[in-house]
A protein has these predicted regions:
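Bacterial Sec-dependent N-terminal signal peptides
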Residues: 1-34
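Secondary-structure transition/capping residues
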Residues: 5-8, 42, 154, 173
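Generic macromolecular interface patches on structured domains
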Residues: 18, 77-78, 172
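TPR-adjacent "capping" and linker segments in tetratricopeptide-repeat scaffold/adaptor proteins
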Residues: 21-28, 122-141, 173-182
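Post-signal peptide N-terminal segment of secreted/secretory-pathway proteins
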Residues: 35-154, 160-163, 167
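Solenoidal tandem-repeat scaffolds enriched in leucines and small polar residues
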Residues: 155, 162-182
């Protein structure tokens, strides 16, 4: 009788896990569709952040990559609006850039902590480094923007992120502190 209960418990446990994985895949594919259509990006970001609240997903590369893709799409939409002189919430634009950097740093730290193979870590670092380096100047611009608006906390946060990202492992191979001209 005990053996049957244990077997039943194991079956229910596996069934619950498989349902959770199926729901996760469904949510990720739904978010990818939102990214393609470029609509409801705030909702897409919230879906991915809710997935990351579950400890089972914290080491899931797909969830982190999809969250980064959502933030990147929001950045690209804001950048396009600014370039075409369309109305854009500049505060939201700069805060989104900071979030993009924070997500990349957090994901990199989780990969290192999870003892993933160095080849896999380097591959994702290179992917993120190229994107982050092309937008890094906007951290500085955002910091100056917030300081001019007398929002010193946000300004300091963006400028601090601009400085510290140069020493982070994602971008450290580019030797930014040595290349900086004063």
């Amino acid at each position: 009788m005990k053996k049957i209960r244990i077997q039943l418990l194991i079956i229910l446990l596996f069934a619950g896990c498989s349902l959770s994985l199926m729901a996760q895949k469904k949510e990720i594919s739904q978010v990818k569709q939102m990214i393609k259509k470029s609509n409801n990006l705030n909702q897409a970001e919230q879906i991915m952040r809710d997935l990351l609240k579950d400890s089972a997903n914290i080491n899931n590369d797909k969830v982190w990559n999809t969250l980064f893709d959502v933030l990147n799409k929001k950045y690209l939409n804001g950048n396009e609006a600014l370039y075409l002189k369309r109305p854009c919430d500049t505060t939201l634009f700069y805060n989104n850039i900071a979030e993009m950097f924070k997500v990349a740093i957090c994901f990199d730290s989780i990969q290192v902590k999870a003892n993933k193979p160095q080849k896999e870590i380097n591959k994702s670092r290179e992917k993120y480094a190229n994107m982050l380096l092309s937008t890094r100047a906007n951290l500085f611009n955002g910091g100056v923007f917030f300081i001019r608006k007398k929002d010193y906390n946000n300004g300091f946060d963006l400028l601090s992120l601009y400085i510290t990202i140069a020493q982070h492992a994602i971008i450290s191979s580019y030797n930014l502190p040595q290349k900086a001209k004063y």
